[in-house]
Amino acid sequence: MEKELIFGHRNPDTDAIGTAIAYSYFQNQHGYNTEAVALGEANDETSFALKKFGFEAPRVVKTVANEVKAIMLVDHNEPQQSVEDRDQVKVTHVIDHHRISNFATIDPLFYRAEPVGCTSTVLWEMFKEQNMEIPANIAGIMLSAIISDTLLLKSPTTTDIDKEAVEELAKIAGVDYKEYGLELLKAGTNIAAKSVEELIDLDAKSFELGSKTARIAQVNVVDVPEALERKDAFLAAMEKDAKANGYDLFMLVITNVLDSDSEVLFIGDDESKSVFAKAFGKELVDSEAHLLGVVSRKKQIVPPLTRAFEA
């Protein structure tokens, strides 16, 4: 069987990398020939999880058509979030937990998406449906993905299925998920050593919102005031990046993983700022707004913005 590559979105997080690794194991057990790769370097949080459970970071690829004819996607489906030459290969499988947008294929494919907190939760269900045993290290990296995406089950994206998956995977992996979860999340909140340019690209995704092209970046912290000491530098970097890449608006969501609130920095024209205010019922003051209880880009930021821009 010809080799296929499995990968998550650009600027990969723990779900994108962890689920790619776990899904590659799953598919190889079913006779496929796959390799988990990544569309970017593993961040600090993901590196912590990989080391904890004995994995090397997947190799990073920029293109895939030079290697394979077919690919499998996890944790994304939108082309602007995927590998740049995706249109030159066949997508055979997708496992996701996001909206479906700008996605089309010539041939039928396996596609499974569910409104749960993490793609690894969907994969956990697939393991159970197949009565497949999950190795301890695979359980650990899947557990890490769910903890990361749901902010230790505190995100509004969290479902009962996510909670059940976390409890079972933690037992298999042999860890206390609450204790390990805090260690994992804190590993990803050390932003002091990174430049503003790195931070606005670390976990950033592009979206089509009505007629606007938006870039929405997110960083997790435990000290928001410390992060905002670099506010002017953040805004300048966002402005520069937006102009260079043709984004109509750029949002940086600074999320406090302990309090489950976010501070937003915003670059955009007056129309976009007005739509932001309409979407969240909150005016931007000096390009900044506090969003109480908002932690999820997927569920709490992109949907209201999409509705507001398309109204």
Curated annotation (Swiss-Prot):
Required cofactor names: Mn(2+)
Span of the signal peptide: none
CC per GO annotation: cytoplasm
Keywords on record: Cytoplasm, Hydrolase, Manganese, Metal-binding
Residues annotated for Mn(2+) 2 binding in this entry: D15, D75, H97, D149
One Pfam family in the UniProt entry: DHHA2
Localization per record: Cytoplasm
UniProt key word Metal-binding: yes
EC number: 3.6.1.1
Cofactor-binding details, from the entry: Binds 2 manganese ions per subunit.
Catalytic reaction list: diphosphate + H2O = 2 phosphate + H(+)
Main location: cytoplasm
InterPro entries per UniProt: DDH_dom, DHH_sf, DHHA2, DHHA2_dom_sf, Mn-dep_inorganic_PyrPase, Oligoribo/pAp-PDE_c-di-AMP_PDE
Top-rank taxon, per record: Bacteria
Positions with a binding annotation for Mn(2+) 1: H9, D13, D75
GO molecular function, one term: inorganic diphosphate phosphatase activity
Membership in a protein family: Belongs to the PPase class C family.
PANTHER family (alphabetical): BIFUNCTIONAL OLIGORIBONUCLEASE AND PAP PHOSPHATASE NRNA (PTHR47618:SF1)
HAMAP family: PPase_C
Name by which UniProt lists this protein: Probable manganese-dependent inorganic pyrophosphatase
Name of the coding gene: ppaC
